[in-house]
Amino acid sequence: MWKILPAAGIDPARDRTGSTWAEFIRSQATAVIAVDFACVDTALLARFHVLFVIEAATRRVHPAGITTNPTGAWTTQAARNLLMRLPEEHGFRFLVRDGAGQFTAAFDTVLTAAGITAIRATARSPQANAFAERWVRTLRHELLDRTIIWNERQLRALLAEYVDHYNRHRPHRSREQRAPDDVDTTTPTRPIERIQRRTTCGGLNNEYWPAA
């Protein structure tokens, strides 16, 4: 991290007032993504590991894979597959990850080949990877803690539906109540008189939009 901050034009001096890590995230938000695993236990006592990437600027989530055995080789291949799905001019320069054994040197090499520098978060400092940690809590609160997961097929279906809801419809305070995929920053020119609603994830979440 002490090599990354100067490259971004930020003084990492220890006696500097304020949080240099927070300054780095703010100044480089559009170039920063974070990666982590969310663990999901099923009713049949199986544990699945959901690998995901989240964009710091938009909070957009990209699921990268689900497995019961997240080895280093599997995680590296999942990262390779995800990078192939991203737009060629994605603009990401930094990826924040923790020190889990699944994030091997081969994982970092795949990122380097795509022009992305891996930054290892400080041990026992969840705030260093706050975007990923926050999404795991949101996923649990809005989905996993409110339903029973039986198997991988059900988990994949629910996760796909929830991520679509999260990216396209869930408002965020940091984005002035806009969803990650919402790029429209204009405000309505007239009052909204009627609202339509649709439920997702078996009725666990609601989506609202102005009626035609």
Where are the model-predicted features located?
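Charged DNA-binding/catalytic regions of mobile-element recombinases
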Residues: 1-212
